[in-house]
Amino acid sequence: MLSLAAKLVAFFWRTADTPREEAGQLEPELAEGDTKLKTVRGVVTRYCSDYGMIDDMIYFSSDAVTSRVLLNVGQEVIAVVEENKVSNGLKAIRVEAVSDKWEDDSRNHGSPSDCGPRVLIGCVTSLVEGAGCISQTTYFSLESVCEGFEPCKGDWVEAEYRIRPGTWSSEATSVKPLRYKRVDKVCISSLCGRNGVLEESIFFTLDSLKLPDGYTPRRGDVVNAVVVESSQSCYVWRALCMTLVKRRDAAPVHEATHFYGTILLKNKGDIEVTQVTHFGTLKEGRSKTMVIWIENKGDIPQNLVSCKLAGWDKSKQFRFQMLDKDQMCPVVSFVSVPEKENSSDENINSLNSHTKNKTSQMSESSLVNNRGISPGDCTCKGENGEKDNILSRKQMTEPEPGGLVPPGGKTFIVVICDGKNPGRCKELLLLCFSDFLIGRYLEVNVISGEESLIAAREPFSWKKLKSSQALTSAKTTVVVTAQKRNSRRQLPSFLPQYPIPDRLRKCVEQKIDILTFQPLLAELLNMSNYKEKFSTLLWLEEIYAEMELKEYNMSGIILRRNGDLLVLEVPGLAEGRPSLYAGDKLILKTQEYNGHAIEYISYVTEIHEEDVTLKINPEFEQAYNFEPMDVEFTYNRTTSRRCHFALEHVIHLGVKVLFPEEIILQSPQVTGNWNHAQDTKSSGQSTSKKNRKTMTDQAEHGTEERRVGDKDLPVLAPFTAEMSDWVDEIQTPKARKMEFFNPVLNENQKLAVKRILSGDCRPLPYILFGPPGTGKTVTIIEAVLQVHFALPDSRILVCAPSNSAADLVCLRLHESKVLQPATMVRVNATCRFEEIVIDAVKPYCRDGEDIWKASRFRIIITTCSSSGLFYQIGVRVGHFTHVFVDEAGQASEPECLIPLGLMSDISGQIVLAGDPMQLGPVIKSRLAMAYGLNVSFLERLMSRPAYQRDENAFGACGAHNPLLVTKLVKNYRSHEALLMLPSRLFYHRELEVCADPTVVTSLLGWEKLPKKGFPLIFHGVRGSEAREGKSPSWFNPAEAVQVLRYCCLLAHSISSQVSASDIGVITPYRKQVEKIRILLRNVDLMDIKVGSVEEFQGQEYLVIIISTVRSNEDRFEDDRYFLGFLSNSKRFNVAITRPKALLIVLGNPHVLVRDPCFGALLEYSITNGVYMGCDLPPALQSLQNCGEGVADPSYPVVPESTGPEKHQEPS
């Protein structure tokens, strides 16, 4: 039974032999008109700044040099040479220096491809027929893949590769999985469409799964499998092959064989049925009729038992009537569907009077049954006399007179479509004859009137980039130096520039393989390549940012005056396109005249919506007479330079911090006794209603305020006391009786605070793993306060990736009411405007203007980037005893290192708080992402053995080593029905519902819920995605209109009215955000927040509406036309964990089912009976019975709630 799996395992490490002769026959591609290119090896005999000679025969320019090794006279090189047809001279178009390493490894001193193969560890990023790419750039053919392994996008592989000298690209010669294992007797826990999951942790897809002949996987089957490491949405393993161990006892009713294919649609029994059954485009509120003819071309009469609808369309937009053969065929017409019961007769279908009379008669006939059924509800005889399991006998109706179609006779059905649900829709019409069944798809595309308000204003066209020739045209440019920008701080500026290497820039711009510049990228991250690898990734991100900014450059712009300053209007600035900040540099150029242009350097001093105030050379400001100017945006490299600087200065932290393996226990920092009576009182089951509310508010909003008296603070003894008593008081603050400032923390939160305070494993980073709504920030606040008061020698640096997160920490510490004045300071970036800082935080910001003074405060709060300011004033290593990084999962590793470099590697303590399952750092360069810049320091540590989940060793401690990780599991935000799916997909079913029941159950009675007591709606919309103008962003008018309607229903609901400020709309595309805001503005609901997933991280709303936008069902195979960044499990997790009481998801199930996370959400919604809208794909049709009461015992169905219940206090 396991022969297939055994064969795959046996050959996993056997590489297919590839003749070396084939590799040597690869010729460089020739441009049109070239004679021939050849590769030569020689020595540089002359080298100047912009050109050189090889063997005094071959000329090359500096642009042709692609090696990262600096060229010198006498340097051995390999060059691709072409011959000039006119002069017969030789010119090198690419020159690569031969490094010493290559010379040592090379046997015959040939080209780089002749050197020993190098090893690449990477992820398969693309696959086409017969080939693929690893980490975006390294090509491999399937012939180089080890036998038995069929790679899939997302698989982690180990490959041997060489550099092809003709094209300077890397090509893998051997590919095998990085890690694999065999798992026995595991259960198929989920199967949605063609995707499934084993034991809720191993992904598989039927598109690439190897199976024994005759076996089709089914939910509940017990199987053995061989799995490989692979990044598949929220899963890290992929099943390669699978064999059955034990089949489920019996298939449930809804898993019966589908009969939807060509057999069902095929004409049978000499009966021919109209083939074209598409209603085309129909306006909402209108109706359209269609005649479907049924003709008997045989010699025997055929009995039509019944005609039914399969019930795919939940909106019931289709209805039909069958007329006798002697009746006149009705005229196809368009009519309005009455919106009210007392509508006039003009809104009724205008069939002839005979037809109208017959309608009332036939509506009661057994031949017309407009009741939704599932395809397993009727049984008819097939052509061979066998039973077809399609319609159940209990729903069959006896044939009435007129159901017989004689030989040569005809009858017809009038099908009416009422436009109700915007978007495309498909229904299945079943014509059940006595001996066979014929089906036809009924399709329509319904459009609403509101869609015209947001229709595309102009056709989409790609923005044309300026040609390289235009960018490098000869000019004489005079640079007028502007006065230095005003700075609130006069800091020594010794931060090195870390310029981007020219050869790296050429690799990106000319699309040369990045491994030719930095082969270390192919290696796993380690201490020896740490700095070089991250420096290259930072430069790649900078290059992309610069290229992106160039797309926003403007020409012929006229500036406006505002007093002595000039104002530039930048369209799209309010949406972050481009992203500008105060202090950024812009270049203004006069229009070119006779090849001359004057260039002025300006600085941004103020930003208001799309108006940017500039500070330029005073002479220019006075002389400017509204002449048109060209504007170039520049990338602010300050944060990047600080990251480079940190990479150089964190080396002292060493392997024990950056690559921790062993745990060496140290003596605890605090040895005091905790007030267990306080613990018991705050966490007991009998906590009062007031305390329960306080706990919920504290976990959700962190607004708990508690004024601590003198007895709670470690105050030094009065100076009047004896000296010995004073010394004893100083030496024993660690032994004092400990109490929590926030008494309503739950047990996990208290344990985390105690472990942070103890610091047993310092300097190893301690991780506070905080899933959504579990009170992570509240725990950090308590830990900071405890360290501050228990350790009088401490100096705490609290950082976060964003200003908003840093402000929140500062606000919560301020609201604690326990800190003395001049204890805490908030350090802002120089360019941050004071107006956008909340009032409660402003006093702490004023103390932060003087960096020297700020560095002496006991608690310093800033962003990760701004913590680099302390390097500039010469703060020594060890200045900070504790470094807390909140939302550490959102910071790139180099960014997180900026504050860590200021901490001692011996006695310092690092605390990283965040969730590796939520959004990581924002990285735009695909190359930088492919090589790991998008993985945060927090996430990388969590993947190391010391921090990994181990249920066997630490099952009693939350499955993680309690000395290094504490996972918070009590969720104070969401309803149970909304929490179950993310808990299962991302958090091992460990999240516990602890939210305030009066909040999370407040919308259970909303009249629009498909299932009362279940606050989730998945509304299927088969809309059309579109783009307009030169914007590459997508929008979906049908979904935008549906979002508008839900917002109106909620805001104006009689039974459950929701404030506009309590509703949030999440959509991944800027253009959809823009369109939804237009619609909401028309109905005066502008208080509803509409934004991307990134804008909602860390926030919560009573109601969340998600518009997924993408709806193209025809181009699944092309990432550019499929889900794009929508298929990101971390974005999915953030989106569905924002609501407290209601989640509404709008999307096309035919597209979303291909993503594992959205597929799981669809399965969850259908099984619990909360799916509505368009028809489902055939792969999901079988699940509809689960929502109608036929539940699959292997899949969790959440019981519906009826309202607020008694809330049990967390222990």
Curated annotation (Swiss-Prot):
The keyword Transferase does not apply. It is an enzyme of class 3 (hydrolase). A motif (DEAG box) lies at residues 886-889. InterPro entries: DNA2/NAM7-like_C, DNA2/NAM7_AAA_11, MOV-10-like_beta-barrel, P-loop_NTPase, SF1_C_Upf1. Keywords: ATP-binding, Cytoplasm, Developmental protein, Disease variant, Helicase, Hydrolase, Nucleotide-binding. Its main location: cytoplasm. Residues 345-372, 674-688 have a biased composition (Polar residues). It comes from the Eukaryota. It catalyses: ATP + H2O = ADP + phosphate + H(+). Residues 340-385, 674-710, 1192-1211 are annotated as: Disordered. GO terms for biological process: germ cell development; male meiosis I; piRNA processing; regulatory ncRNA-mediated post-transcriptional gene silencing; spermatogenesis; transposable element silencing by piRNA-mediated DNA methylation. Changing residue 848 to R: In SPGF73; uncertain significance. GO terms for molecular function: ATP binding; ATP hydrolysis activity; magnesium ion binding; RNA binding; RNA helicase activity. ATP binds at residues 770-777. One of its GO terms (cellular component) is pi-body. Its EC number is 3.6.4.13. It is found in: Cytoplasm. Residues 694-710 have a biased composition (Basic and acidic residues). PANTHER family: CANCER/TESTIS ANTIGEN 55 (PTHR45418), CANCER_TESTIS ANTIGEN 55 (PTHR45418:SF1). Belongs to the DNA2/NAM7 helicase family. SDE3 subfamily. ATP-dependent RNA helicase required during spermatogenesis to repress transposable elements and prevent their mobilization, which is essential for germline integrity. Acts via the piRNA metabolic process, which mediates the repression of transposable elements during meiosis by forming complexes composed of piRNAs and Piwi proteins and governs the methylation and subsequent repression of transposons. Involved in the primary piRNA metabolic process. It is linked to Spermatogenic failure 73: An autosomal recessive male infertility disorder characterized by non-obstructive azoospermia due to meiotic arrest. This is RNA helicase Mov10l1. It comes from Homo sapiens (Human).
